[in-house]
């Protein structure tokens, strides 16, 4: 399966409004949903937040110029919220999944879908 297929099938198909797969090494984009792109600055901030989860909690996570309040952050996942929507970030060995949801998708369902893809990618060595 291509990286784009993971986005289209597992994330967008699960109800996310936007998604992107970044390299966990340098933050470069491997695939993204149509019209969605995490900026280089945002990607670097995400990488640094996975290295220091306290930074995520203190500074929040900005995706597409929207600052989200961090609810949970550790070395494998970051959950953040803005109004009725939010973002789930999941880090694997080689990737960072970025999945943005709105009020049509419950936060728990968003986390489960993104974490499930992250678990699958880890099992596959990614």
Swiss-Prot record:
The keyword Cytoplasm applies. Keywords: Actin-binding, Cytoplasm, Cytoskeleton. GO terms for biological process: actin nucleation; chemotaxis to cAMP; negative regulation of actin filament polymerization; positive regulation of actin filament polymerization. It comes from the Eukaryota. GO terms for molecular function: actin binding; actin monomer binding; phosphatidylinositol-4,5-bisphosphate binding. The keyword Cytoplasm applies. It is found in: Cytoplasm, Cytoskeleton. InterPro entries: PFN (IPR048278), PFN_euk (IPR005455), PFN_sf (IPR036140), Profilin_CS (IPR027310). Pfam families: Profilin. One of its GO terms (cellular component) is cell cortex. Belongs to the profilin family. Occurs in many kinds of cells as a complex with monomeric actin in a 1:1 ratio. Binds to actin and affects the structure of the cytoskeleton. At high concentrations, profilin prevents the polymerization of actin, whereas it enhances it at low concentrations. By binding to PIP2, it inhibits the formation of IP3 and DG. This is Profilin-3. It comes from Dictyostelium discoideum (Social amoeba). The lineage of its organism: Eukaryota, Amoebozoa, Evosea, Eumycetozoa, Dictyostelia.
């Amino acid at each position: 399966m291509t990286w784009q297929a993971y986005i289209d099938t597992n994330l967008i198909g699960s109800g996310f409004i936007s998604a992107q797969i970044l390299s966990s090494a340098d933050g470069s984009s491997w695939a993204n949903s149509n019209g969605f792109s995490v900026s280089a600055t945002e990607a670097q901030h995400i990488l640094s937040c996975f290295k220091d989860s306290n930074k995520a909690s203190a500074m929040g996570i900005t995706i597409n110029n929207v600052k989200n309040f961090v609810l949970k952050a550790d070395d494998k996942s970051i959950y953040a919220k803005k109004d009725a929507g939010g973002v789930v970030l999941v880090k694997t060995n080689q990737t960072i999944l970025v999945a943005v949801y709105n009020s049509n998708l419950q936060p728990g369902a968003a986390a489960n879908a993104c974490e499930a893809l992250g678990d699958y990618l880890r099992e596959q060595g990614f």
